[in-house]
Structures are given as structure tokens and as C-alpha cells.
Amino acid sequence: MVLDSKIVRRYFTWALDTTRESHLRTLSDGPLFKGIGKKLLRKLLIDLIEKKYMAGDIIFHEGESGKALYVVLDGSVKIVKKSSSDSRTLYVLGPGSHFGELALIGHTLRPATAVVENDALLLIMYQSYFDDLIRCNSPISARILLNLAKRLSDYIQLHQPE
């Protein structure tokens, strides 16, 4: 059987478009990219890095210098805080969730370790790309900063002593 190259190309283009649209929905449903139009999100998807991780992979260690923010497109990642005697899971993050944002806004050391719980596909935004967005006064950067500020505000309110 001989396959028509046009049909094969069309199938792979369709599969790629379907995957991109799925990722686009995941991003638009997540808190980091809330309020950013689909056209701008499509551009962002092209510019950012996708990387697959296997269960058990460590994305970063507590105490490391951070250079990127991550968005879970598929799978799950747990954020673990180590103490002198053991470690405890702070969060388990699924599709649409993001982590590592302190690297972009605070240039701080990682406060916890990120471990892949189930095989995961992550979208990575490096510090240099984020800095470029801000320098360009991009509408994407303004919205991301507002969304990060909201997340920080929610976190502070949730953890205030009563």
C-alpha cells in the first residue's frame, strides 16, 4: 500500500493543530493566562518550550536558583518541602496549573522541590523570555503580572494568622 504524501502531511498537520488547540484550552483555563485572548496565547505557545518529563523526574530542587516558570499541560507535578527529618507534599498540580513563578518576579532561590508525579508535559517560560515581554511592554506581560499579583494576594490572604 502506498500512502499519498499529501494525506500524510494533512493528517500530521491536523494532529499538531488538535494538540495545539488542546494546549490552548489548558492555558486559557488556567490562572496564569486568564484574560489573554486566544490569538496572543497562540503566539505564546509558539514561543515557549514544551518538555516531557517522566514520573519521578525532578524539575528543580529546593534552594536552587530559578530561571523559569512552568505550566502543566498534561500529567501532574508535586511540590515538596523538605525538613530535617522528612518531606511533605505542599501541592499536587495538574493541567493548567503553574509553578516556579517566584523565579520570574523575585529572582529568589526555589523554596521547594518540584517532582513529576505522573508523566507530564510542561510548558517552560524562561526568565529571559519574560524579561523580553516586559521590555516590549507586551499586553501579555501586563496580564501575566496582574494574574501573578492576584495569585500572590490570594496566597497571602489564605496564610494570614487569624
Where is each model-derived feature located?
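Cytosolic regulatory regions built on CNB/CRP/Popeye-like sensor folds
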Residues: M1-E162
